[in-house]
Amino acid sequence: MALKKIIVSVTNDLTCDQRVDRVCRTLSGMGFGVLLAGRRLPGSLPPGHRPYATLRMHLLFRKGPLFYAEYNLRLFFLLLNRQPDLLLANDLDTLAANRLAGKILRIPVIYDSHEYFTEVPELTHRPRVKKTWEWLEKRVVPGVAAAYTVCQSIAD
């Protein structure tokens, strides 16, 4: 029987995200074929040896709405082309592409909300941007197969 393939997606450059690395190592140790997809930044260090595959996309935009639009569009096509058995979206900023691809491929999407994304300090004094993320959250979170977070206060 072939390995079940999981694609884990993040918007960072993979090198310093120890929590996601632990999740990927655990999944790999359980026998899953894991691909961690993120982005490459100028000056990004190599991801180093890992017991799972990594892929870093070079994006034209580094921040703002064009970054999120480009990232999610490219991630969406990556997810469709790789034909995984399961998708794991880390944070709200990766969830739109995962939910759409999951719906088309008819596979489950797991949502890792390790922070309350719409309450991060970067959005505190930006009400329009915060409203946009809240609008997206209301539309994409309800359709996930499962979700988890790091603490009870975020789950509540």
Model regions and ranges:
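N-terminal subdomain of nucleotide-sugar transferases
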Residues: 1-43, 146, 152-155
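Short, well-ordered alpha-helical microsegments
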Residues: 17, 94-98, 103, 155-156
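A short, charged, and often flexible helix/loop element on the N-terminal side
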Residues: 51-78, 125-129
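Membrane-proximal helix-turn-helix segments that form the acceptor-binding/catalytic region
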Residues: 73-80, 96, 100-104, 128-149
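Short N-terminal targeting/anchoring amphipathic segment
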Residues: 76-94, 107-110
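Helix N-cap/beta->alpha junction signal
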Residues: 91, 151-152
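Active-site proximal beta-strand in glycosyltransferases
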Residues: 102-120, 148
